[in-house]
Protein backbone atom coordinates (compact mmCIF):
# COMPACT_ATOMS: atom_id res chain seq x y z
CA UNK A 1 0.00 0.00 0.00
CA UNK A 2 1.37 3.38 -0.96
CA UNK A 3 0.81 6.89 0.37
CA UNK A 4 -1.05 7.64 -2.86
CA UNK A 5 -3.42 4.72 -2.21
CA UNK A 6 -4.15 6.05 1.27
CA UNK A 7 -4.69 9.56 -0.06
CA UNK A 8 -7.13 8.38 -2.73
CA UNK A 9 -9.00 6.09 -0.35
CA UNK A 10 -9.45 8.73 2.33
CA UNK A 11 -10.14 11.74 0.07
CA UNK A 12 -13.95 11.27 0.28
CA UNK A 13 -13.67 11.56 4.09
CA UNK A 14 -12.13 15.05 4.08
CA UNK A 15 -15.38 17.08 4.19
CA UNK A 16 -16.57 15.05 7.17
CA UNK A 17 -13.24 15.14 8.99
CA UNK A 18 -12.92 18.90 8.51
CA UNK A 19 -16.48 19.52 9.70
CA UNK A 20 -17.92 20.61 6.36
CA UNK A 21 -20.23 17.60 6.09
CA UNK A 22 -22.57 16.32 8.83
CA UNK A 23 -21.85 12.67 8.05
CA UNK A 24 -19.24 10.68 6.12
CA UNK A 25 -19.88 10.10 2.44
CA UNK A 26 -20.46 6.51 1.27
CA UNK A 27 -17.14 6.70 -0.55
CA UNK A 28 -15.42 7.40 2.76
CA UNK A 29 -16.53 4.08 4.23
CA UNK A 30 -15.65 2.28 1.01
CA UNK A 31 -12.21 3.87 0.99
CA UNK A 32 -11.52 2.85 4.58
CA UNK A 33 -12.68 -0.70 3.86
CA UNK A 34 -10.33 -0.77 0.86
CA UNK A 35 -7.36 -0.03 3.10
Curated annotation (Swiss-Prot):
InterPro entries membership: Bifun_inhib/LTP/seed_sf (IPR036312), Bifunc_inhib/LTP/seed_store (IPR016140), Plant_nsLTP (IPR000528)
Keyword Calcium in annotation: no
Gene Ontology terms: biological process: defense response to fungus; killing of cells of another organism; lipid transport
Gene Ontology MF annotations: lipid binding
Domain of life: Eukaryota
Keywords: Antimicrobial, Disulfide bond, Fungicide, Lipid-binding, Plant defense, Transport
Disulfide bond residue pairs: 13-28
Tissue occurrence: Seeds.
Record's function text: Plant non-specific lipid-transfer proteins transfer phospholipids as well as galactolipids across membranes. May play a role in wax or cutin deposition in the cell walls of expanding epidermal cells and certain secretory tissues. Inhibits the growth of F.oxysporum and P.infestans.
Family listed: Belongs to the plant LTP family.
Stated name of the protein: Non-specific lipid-transfer protein 1
Amino acid sequence: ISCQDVKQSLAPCLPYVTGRAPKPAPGCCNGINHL
